[in-house]
Amino acid sequence: MAKKHVSDLDLKGKVVLERADFNVPLKDGKITNDNRIVQALPTIEYILDQGGRLVLFSHLGKVKEESDKEKLTLRPVAERLSEKLGKDVNFIPHTRGEVLEKAIAELKDGEVLLVENTRFEDLDGKKESKNDPELGKYWASLGDVFVNDAFGTAHRSHASNVGIASNLESAAGDLMEKEIKFIGGVVNNPDKPVVAILGGAKVSDKIGVIENLLNVADKVLIGGGMAYTFLKAQGYEIGKSLLEADKVDFAKDLLERAGDKIVLPVDAKVAREFSNEAQFTVVTIDQIPADQEALDIGPKTVELFEKELKGAHTVVWNGPMGVFEFENFAQGTVGVCEAIAEMKDATTIIGGGDSAAAAMMLGFEDDFSHISTGGGASLEYLEGKELPGIQSISDK
């Protein structure tokens, strides 16, 4: 069922509650990457241009004890957002109560305020994270309509997304709608042929994704640390490479079911120690020395993956091909990233997390159709799960 979009709502003079995702990295109280704030701007600017009176909600980090409050306040976000918008953002250092209610009542058309970190409510019985019905109802009572633009928390059922949406007419923001279109599109109605590239360290993190994408994709290319559990299942000796011994039988079963759909590395960069400075060699998969571990896919694998990508209409990539934080072991990830970035006629999607970080680090963010803002949310969406944050948005 299609979900309402913010443009379907009448916003002029209305108090618009919006759940944004301002969960940005901080160091010594300073924001080190404001990408999430930048990506939230189109919806915020649209609401303000339409004459909405905007009340923004977001979480920041995990709030476990009273002392976390000082370092996890949203005040730095309010300051950065104000810079980006070129207008005042009234920061309210409360999540409920008279000060907040008065500030909302005094909002004029086109003005914006930011409520303090929603997870401050977790100090008293996890009210935000457990979607306390009274809290959801209270927050909903502060506004006329609700806009959810926080895909990063769409897989969570919290008071500030599902709780508010259950009590108010609600719609998706631009960012949320883009995620539904691209990530949801891969799962529900992709333009074929579809090639999925999966990497990262653990098979266990991606079991649901692999299972679901095998139903959708024409090919699933597997790299990263997780590939070695599959290679072990094929009978290869993998030396000291990453292995999830309890997942070998699962990998074996999957390989049998998938036939030639799954494509594994044919060579690897191996080293004796886990370090960027480690001496490395490139070996074929059947030649990994017993005392060494694979830290990246090799050049022949990059070539093979490039060949498998040719002709694909939809490509979804989730997870790096090696230890891309080490420059000497980043070539596999760089090679795959470049190959996908050059596919101008295909729909190319990065499913969040480390691959998104890699693409941005390499300067390729503008070369993909879509880079997801969700980590866990993208994975659960790719698994084919219903996400409560999306489900709770009003249908058209």
From Swiss-Prot:
InterPro entries xrefs: Phosphoglycerate_kinase, Phosphoglycerate_kinase_N, Phosphoglycerate_kinase_sf
GO cellular component term of the entry, any: cytosol
Keywords in alphabetical order: ATP-binding, Cytoplasm, Glycolysis, Kinase, Nucleotide-binding, Transferase
Binding residues for substrate: D21, F22, N23, R36, H59, L60, G61, K62, R119, R156
Entry's localization field: Cytoplasm
Main location, first listed in the record: cytoplasm
Example of a GO biological process term: gluconeogenesis
Record-level Gene Ontology MF annotations: ADP binding; ATP binding; phosphoglycerate kinase activity
Enzyme class, first EC level, given as a word: transferase
Pathway field: Carbohydrate degradation; glycolysis; pyruvate from D-glyceraldehyde 3-phosphate: step 2/5
Catalytic activity: (2R)-3-phosphoglycerate + ATP = (2R)-3-phospho-glyceroyl phosphate + ADP
Gene3D superfamilies for the chain: Phosphoglycerate kinase, N-terminal domain
Residues at which ATP binds: K206, E325, G352, G353, D354, S355
PANTHER family to which the protein is assigned, alphabetical: PHOSPHOGLYCERATE KINASE, PHOSPHOGLYCERATE KINASE 1, CHLOROPLASTIC-RELATED
Assembly notes: Monomer.
Family: Belongs to the phosphoglycerate kinase family.
Protein name: Phosphoglycerate kinase
Species per Swiss-Prot/TrEMBL record: Staphylococcus carnosus (strain TM300)
Organism classification: Bacteria, Bacillati, Bacillota, Bacilli, Bacillales
Encoding gene, per UniProt annotation: pgk
